[in-house]
Amino acid sequence: MTVLDHAVVATDSTEVANLCKSLGAPVEMTSPDHPSGTDRVAEVADRSEYRGYDVIANVQGDEPLLKEAHVRATIDLVRDGTWEVGTCATPLNSDDARTDPTVVKLARAANGRALYFSRASIPYKRDERPVAEELEREPYLRHVGIYAYTREALNDWVALAPSQLERLESLEQLRPLEAGLRIGVTIVGAADPGVDTMADVLRMEEKLSAQGVPSFA
């Protein structure tokens, strides 16, 4: 991705690390004890060779088909100084996905500030009109697994202990949100679903195979 000055895989898995090395991909081994991906990213970002970077991006491993445009849009939220932390979301137009706990939903303010992330359906739809009828007025949003941080915000995030809401929802972004850190959300075009279940793994393998990507299983 040309939007990045440098990309590296951060992992605590020797299997993943060995595969990356065989493909010529930069990789950094980390502690196996991190409570979240952001904590893992912070460990690597604090190493001497990465301390010169002022904006750090975290592309999560369960978003293998993330588009470059989504990465760029997220980084731009932080790079222009508007937000300490940035992330992105895509319109959610399926009633089934709206109630699926593996699909993370979010609500944001008119200025783009994240109000809450949840596995539950937010905002709650009191009547039974199809979601698609309400998209233009107030879209339902699916969170896409990428973050950008200023170095200071990244350090502030990982200095916090895992929060009650973070533990309840198993969503790391609730930790800084609960502590008052401002998270900006940009809305992007359609994004491929993330990988959260074994069915998702099989679906993704089929899709990658159709694109000519070899299997490393």
Residue ranges and their predicted role:
Residues 67-163:
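Conserved core of the sugar-phosphate nucleotidyltransferase
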Residues 11-12, 53, 74, 83-88, ...:
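Structured catalytic cores of enzymes that bind and process phosphorylated ligands/cofactors
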Residues 131-217:
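Conserved alpha/beta core of the MobA/IspD/sugar-nucleotide pyrophosphorylase nucleotidyltransferase superfamily
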Residues 8, 14-59, 63-73:
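Short phosphate-binding loop-to-helix
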Residues 6, 26, 113, 182-184:
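Conserved beta-strand segments of alpha/beta enzyme cores
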Residues 1-4:
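Short, acidic, metal-binding catalytic loop of nucleotide-sugar glycosyltransferases
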